[in-house]
Structures are given as structure tokens and as C-alpha cells.
């Protein structure tokens, strides 16, 4: 099949209520979108340069200006178009977004005499719609070096801290509001209530965004895009690909072929579990045993980015070969989600690591177009969508698993021996956590086989075996995460079982690093 340039199909949801989030480069932009959607209102993130185009096409009921790393008085600092303030659309500016609003409307922004970072006690004017029914004093999350020293005409100060006289500003008549703190961060006690007030009290939202409405529109959009074409999907059995498979099966039925590429890098028994879950469904299910092929390509490779690239490219090669066998294939479907796109780097941000679904793909593939119906959804939304689709709980709520599989949970070169060791150790870790009464406090947990060997003693013999790292985190959005305080008795039991039951490991360590500064995965 002749290679054709990649052409991405963008799915536009026909949702009646939308909030435009104007992106000024802040680190919490996706979190703002998540918070808005949690309140049943759809949101889109758009650069400031495209804000007016978006407004003309989508008619949002409200606008949120994000934070950002710049100072508004600097040359080339990003600013909203001034026309945006004359459209009679409610606007909420967050941190830099508040400063940008003040600057554009004639206020004054300058460096703060005292910078504010972290939790800060704040006093609120609860008489304004934005702060209705919240506590008049509560802690918020501050992160700023500049402040609004003079308010624009028509605005009043709506919140104060010990060091900031204008911690929030309000123009009730024009429905323009600014907050110097980050309401979207969990550390802001009344943050979600403030966002809710903006959506419902200020913008007049009714709340029509949910997975039921998304599913209905997504099916229509996929059908309109695909028509009578054939769709090929890589089915890993993870949450994302499983939900996507169910959605596409609902949309195009027999025109969907799901290829399960068993690259030999999966968790214990997972390959057979995936096949058992999907082989009897109406979709066309094909399992490809490609373990030796992948391990051959990965032989001698230790660099994690090279591993990801190799696995991504080999996945596509397998798809091309399978496509030749099954005939004409028009569309390649991918379970790309928001976090994949964010962590693979965008303009103006550093690349953290390439995701298998994004940076690991070659530039050209032998399909007409790429479709990514889940690209705008957060992980928890995808789980909710899976429930809406009727998928079994063990598929919807299974542990997140990266596309490259255990290849990025083994430090250094990948070998069959290391894979066998890690599978057994990881299975014990997951099993013990799932049987302990702490599962509700865990978002993701797994084992990592390090490349470090240490000296140990077992019986009368000296050992020189691998060190295993255990990881468990709690997160609501996977943009940030805290390590979980696992009870000592659980850690003790896990350590004892692994050392005694898994040959090749003689030392266990527990990862107590949050995200940031670390990522959840080790590679």
C-alpha cells in the first residue's frame, strides 16, 4: 500500500454551552478545562491569537483567561484582543489572566512588593456573584510576582490578602472578573465553588456536558467522517483503547477491525485477558503475536526515548502489514487523550517525554487519515464514557498502562529474563494493594525493574541481583500526583513475597517522589 501523508481528522462536538479558555501559557491550563467540565460545562483551550475566530464560530457563554509565565508590561507579552471585552460575554481572568484584563482596560500592573507563593489566607467580598455562598475567609493558592496596583475604571476590589490589596477585582455590570489566585488548584479551598459560581451565576450555564451527550455527538461525527470506510484500531486492552474500540464499534460496527498487537511487553496474563474480553464481540478482532519482532528491534537499546520511538514505529509497521492482509483500510484510529498531547510538548513548552501515541509515530503511515475521538477527554472522562458504553468494570477501571508497556518500566536493555522478573513482581505488588483496604486511595501503582544490582544474602549464599522499585500515586487528573503513604505492614508483606517468590530480585525500594518534579512513570 502506498504511503500517504498523515491527515488528522478533528472532531467538533456540537455542544450548546461552551466555555472558551484563552491560553496564555500557564501550567494549569488543562486543569482549568478539567474543572469546568467537572461542573458539566464543555470547555475548549485556544491560543489568544485565535480567540476571536473561536468566538465567532462557537459563541461561548463565557471566557476564562489562564495564568502564564509572562509579565504584561514586557515587550511581546501575550494579551487578549481588546475587542473581546466589548462582546458582552462574561470573562474570568486567573492570575496572569487578571493582570492582562486590568492592563488592557486601563489599570496598572507592576511588580509586587512582596511575592506570594503557596497557600494564602484571603478575605472575600461574598456580595458579588462570583463569591456567592463561599466562606468570607479561606486559603487560596497564590503564585505571582506581579499585582494589579490600580484597578481599571468600573472595577472594585473583591478580595484581599495581607500583602495584596487587589486579590480579586469585579465589574458586575459588564460581568468581568479577575482573581489573582489559582481557583483551579485543589489547594484553593473554595476554588471549585468559585468556578461554579462563574459558570452558573455569572454565565448562566445550564450544564449540558456529560459523557452521554459526548457519546451521541462523537458517534455522529465518526459516522460522518468515516461513512463507508474501513477503520483499523490498535487495541491494547488498556482503558483508552478499550473505550475507543467500544465507541467505534457502536459507530461503524463491522467496518471496524481491532488489531491487538501483543508486543510481549504486557503485564502478567494481560494478553490472554484482552483476547478473552474482545474476541466474541461484533467487531473484527485480530491478535498478532509480535514479541520476538519487538524484542529484536529493542535489543541493545537502553535510552527511553529510543525505546518509545522504536515501539511506535514498529506498531505502525505491524498495522501496515495487517492492513495489506485485510484489504483497503481508510482510517487509523488512536486512543490519544489530553495528557498524551500535553506531555509530548506544545509550542513554547519543553518536551517532557514522547508518548507512544504522539511522538513515537513516524511521519507517514499507509492510511488515508487519522481519527482520534478521545483526544479532548481527560482520563476520568474516558472511564465515565466507558461506563456509559456498558464496558465491564474490570476494563474501565483497570490500571493505566503506557503504550510502550513494560519497556519503560525496565531500566536499560529489555530482555526476556527481565520481562519475566518484572511481570511476577508487578503482579504481587498489584495483588497485595488490591486486597488491602487502601485501593480507593490509589490512582496508579506498578513496579519498576531498575538496572542496579546489589549484594544480598539468602540463606548461606551471597546474591547479586536486581533492585525493584515500587510506585503508587494518588491524582485526580494525572497532570500532577502525590505519592501514597502505604502502610508499613503492606510494604513488609509485599517485600517478603517478592524476595521469596521472584528469582532475580534481592532488594525493594519505594518511590516517594511526587509529580512534579518527577513524572509518574520512570521513563
UniProtKB/Swiss-Prot annotation:
Enzyme active site: 95 (nucleophile), 182, 184
Pathway stated in the Swiss-Prot or TrEMBL entry: Purine metabolism; GMP biosynthesis; GMP from XMP (L-Gln route): step 1/1
Residue positions binding ATP: 236-242
Pfam families: Asn_synthase, GATase, GMP_synt_C
Positions of the Glutamine amidotransferase type-1 domain: 18-208
EC id: 6.3.5.2
One GO BP annotation of this record: asparagine biosynthetic process
Record key words, sorted: ATP-binding, Glutamine amidotransferase, GMP biosynthesis, Ligase, Nucleotide-binding, Purine biosynthesis
Catalyzed chemical reaction(s): XMP + L-glutamine + ATP + H2O = GMP + L-glutamate + AMP + diphosphate + 2 H(+)
GO molecular function, one term: asparagine synthase (glutamine-hydrolyzing) activity
Annotated Gene Ontology cellular component terms: cytosol
Database matches in SUPFAM superfamilies: Adenine nucleotide alpha hydrolases-like, Class I glutamine amidotransferase-like, GMP synthetase C-terminal dimerisation domain
Subunit structure: Homodimer.
Known function: Catalyzes the synthesis of GMP from XMP.
Protein name: GMP synthase [glutamine-hydrolyzing]
Source organism of this protein record: Treponema denticola (strain ATCC 35405 / DSM 14222 / CIP 103919 / JCM 8153 / KCTC 15104)
